Amino acid sequence: MKLIHAPFIVAFLSSALAAPLSISLGEQDWTKQEWDAIVVGSGPAGIIVADKLSEAGKKTLLLEGGGKSYGITGGTEKPDWLAGTNMSRVDIPGLYKSIFSDPGDLTCGSTVNAFGGCTIGGSSAVNAGMFFQPPSSDWDTYHPDGWKNADLEDATARLLSRQATVTDYSADGNYYLQTGYEAAKKWLVDGAGYSNVVINDQPHDKTKVFGRPAYDYNKGQRGGPVTTYLQTSLSRSNFLLQSGVRVQRVERTGSKATGVVATFDGTTVTIPLSSNGRVVLSGGAIQSPQLLMMSGIGDPATLSQLASSNLIPTSLNPSAWINNTAVGAGLFDNPNTFIELTGPSIASYTYSYKSPITSDTLMYLSSKSGPYTFASQTSVFWTTIPHSDGTPATGVQGTIDSAGYGDFVDDRTITLNVYGTSGLLSSGRVVIDSKGVAGPSDDIYYSDAAGRDASDIATFIHDLFQALPGSGLTPLNIPANATKEEIQTYITTPSQYAKGQVNHWSSSCRIGSCVDAEALRVKGTDNVHVVDGSVVAPLTVNPQFGIMVAAEKGGELIAKL
């Protein structure tokens, strides 16, 4: 269960978050002030949107349900070996995996029926930090006019000027834990004909390419929008970040939002908008649709079910509902399969939160070098599976990790994580249970009637296995000589290696159907917007970069209204 953080208020601070606002809360109660923009959720999109709106002169309130994360936000969760530093566990890339065994106060816990970050920075504070620019085909094929690749070039350039992509993350210039990388390169480049490239130097090529992962790190520490966009926002007198606030719904009169209803410090409050104010929902692809539904905006059938469970206030009777059947529809996550690989040249490495190798922590603390400067992924690769019917190809991705998983964790084992990405046909929707907790429906993965998604991913794995001889690698949980049909059965049968949640949630309030292309305004409303992973279609790459581009563009459009 998620613990409740002590309220954390930040405004008008230096980039080091040194001191709170000198005016006391009693003299200037933020819950009673009128705001030009209320942004709900301080994840990778919400932080960027709030920065854009405050930069444009809007009086901007950024609300976060969780609490402190990075050391720069006042986060203090850390192992003993970080004692005496200004870093928290969040700052250390090599502690990324510890979130799954001990999430502390950083994840959403029982407030969402899925794994995700509920803290300042959202999931960008708890994920691996992989940072890949989507290929132009993602925007040109799956997004409407106004959101094609050419329309997003300026937003992409602005993002890269604030948040660089990094492949040389260790300060000493060395790469660590490379036995898996070398084995994968021999397998894929020498054996399977993949090109060895710098992935983000040629972002639009995702057919048979192999390379090192790109991350959003900065000088050996986790980067992301908390370390960049949030810091410029905090320097402005018209911006306030307030954590420990659980927004329940948008308060509205007809199609116009007038504020948000939230719980803060045990009290329910209504935070008002100014006469021309706007609400921007940036809680992620599960929670933003949930907030819309709880506000009486969505599919009438779903709203009726929520009303019958007393989850929608009686003041929002059916005549006040806004019919938008695209709210919560199309929820996407990457179907994944873990393939355990062993070989005589492999030396696996397991990161430790409490008892790491002393020389590795000393290297990190003294010079920001060594294994703890990255999150364990040593190589990444993509290709595409074409279709004879002329429909877009399916994107598929593989990532090599430094250690084994599940029942295969000896010191000669590493993990290949296989994803299906763009072009897949399967998706589900956001559902809300009887307690009002949102999560994914049970048809997210491999639910297309013809079984094409499973066939494409099985084809990818089968093709990879044909190049295994000579690589020195042997798969442990799937036979190297498995047929495509056997592989397809394996990947679609739930196990600790297959059909699990990757938690790359997106696409549940898409541009064009759920929100408009002009300003990401929720259809049927005047001044409610969604800017987060909900609005983008499934991407070929890990979604954080694309979500941040959408936030750059969306923030720009909303600021002009």
Name each model-derived stretch:
Residues 34-62:
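N-terminal Rossmann-like FAD-binding beta1-loop-alpha1 element of flavoenzymes
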Residues 243, 248-253, 466, 470-539:
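A glycine-rich dinucleotide-binding beta-alpha-beta segment and adjacent secondary-structure elements
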Residues 538-554:
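A conserved FAD-binding loop/helix module that cradles the flavin
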